[in-house]
């Protein structure tokens, strides 16, 4: 149940991420040499990453480099800063919820295995002749 709740929360966070991506994909941000993209991980979750359009380099360094460039208009700096704060927060929340959900699913599986062993032992005992329950 907790794993399912975490999955739903993660989907909600990914929807928030889509809102941030939509904002970055609008003018005047489309004029910048850096874009915000979704990156799917081997752990089957998605994070937001800054990517330089020409070189395809990724990471916060790409964002910092864009901020330092004189070509980046000053009127965009505050928005870019706030977008980066949102990106950091969303990535942290996605990471935490994904991790908690994974742990909850593994825990539920182990509990199911423990219950199966326990029930198997009880059924084995009850099937014996002369069984007297406690």
Indicate where each model-derived feature is located.
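Amphipathic alpha-helical coiled-coil segments
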Residues: 6-16, 76, 80-104, 111
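Helical coiled-coil/dimerization "stalks"
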Residues: 32-40, 117-134
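Negatively charged, low-complexity tracts enriched in Asp/Glu with abundant Ser/Thr
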Residues: 1-31, 126, 130
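Intrinsically disordered, low-complexity regulatory segments enriched in Ser/Thr/Pro
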Residues: 45-92
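Residue-level recognition of alpha-helical coiled-coils
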Residues: 18, 25, 29, 92, ...
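Amphipathic, interaction-prone secondary-structure segments
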Residues: 18-54
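Intrinsically disordered, low-complexity regions
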Residues: 10, 17, 33-34, 50, ...
């Amino acid at each position: 149940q907790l794993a399912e709740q975490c999955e739903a929360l993660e989907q909600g966070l990914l929807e928030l991420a889509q809102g941030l991506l939509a904002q970055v994909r609008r003018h005047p941000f489309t004029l910048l040499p850096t874009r915000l993209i979704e990156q799917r991980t081997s752990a089957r979750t998605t994070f937001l990453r800054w990517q330089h359009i020409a070189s395809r380099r990724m990471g916060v360094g790409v964002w910092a480099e864009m901020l330092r460039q004189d070509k980046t208009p000053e009127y965009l700096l505050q928005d870019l800063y706030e977008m980066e704060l949102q990106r950091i927060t969303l990535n942290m929340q996605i990471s935490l919820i994904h991790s908690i959900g994974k742990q909850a699913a593994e825990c539920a599986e182990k509990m199911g295995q423990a219950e199966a062993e326990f029930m198997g032992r009880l059924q084995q005992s009850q099937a014996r002749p002369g069984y007297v329950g406690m």
